[in-house]
Amino acid sequence: MIRTLLIIAAASLVACVLSIGGFLAVGGVDAIRNGEFEFGPRHWRTDSRHDHDGRHGRMRDAGPTISRTLVWNGTDRLQVDLDADIAFRQAPTASVTISGPKGLVDQVQLENGRLRLADRGTPFHFDHDGRDLRITISAPAVRQFALNGSARLEVADYDQPDLALSIAGSGEVQIRGKTQSAALDIAGSGEADLEGLTLAVARVSVAGSGDARLAPTDSADVKIAGSGDVTLQKRPPVLSSNISGSGDLNFED
């Protein structure tokens, strides 16, 4: 039994050495020296200034700044699964314009109201801080917004009977306009500033350390689990709250 285990261990060691040798042979030394790869227990990450060319681990520059327009029919839901600065404005005509480094802009896809970066089918990830991509969107009837990650979304001229906003991660959202009711869900450390949104009824759920600011005039239902904060511009006539953890419900008045 011991002999078998020793044989397996020796074979694993040989395989590991061969794998590292292969990586170094195809340019791994230069990549490590230049800081283009980070080794971790779960993944390798490319330096944010480069992109993977899909051949053998070498990197290429993300390219010049360009603009690109996407075709969109303007559904009632917008889901953001990438890191970017996004400006949304309610308007009669739907349009999407993306600007940033060519290597990033060319990867942006919009399918069924979902913004994301294309999967290139490699174990390498092009890392960026979200400031590289700027996306301007207009559409007539979006009523649901979902942010996954650390995107920043600013919504202007919102005018719909209701609003549903969810943030998963550390995203930031600011919405200005008017609606009758709003449902806000934050999971993580995201921030939602809805003080510029005129509304009557609000339902707020914060799980984690997120922060929400609203100004409902008639009623509010607030649930906090964790260390999150919810600030209401004033105490509405009807208010219910459930707080578990160190979170706070505050009033500005």
Model region roles, listed by residue range:
Residues 2-3, 79-80, 86, 162-168, ...:
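Terminal or extended low-complexity segments
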Residues 173-253:
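Short, surface-exposed interaction patches in beta-rich subdomains
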Residues 70, 78, 96-98, 117, ...:
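Preference for bulky hydrophobic residues occupying beta-strand positions
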Residues 64-65, 150, 170, 209, ...:
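Short, recurring structural edge motifs at helix starts
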Residues 68-69, 106, 135, 153-154, ...:
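Short, flexible, glycine/charge-rich loop motifs used to bind or transfer phosphoryl groups or to couple energy/partner
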Residues 2-148, 156-159, 176, 197, ...:
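Acidic (Asp/Glu) and glycine-rich low-complexity loops/linkers
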Residues 146-193:
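Right-handed parallel beta-helix
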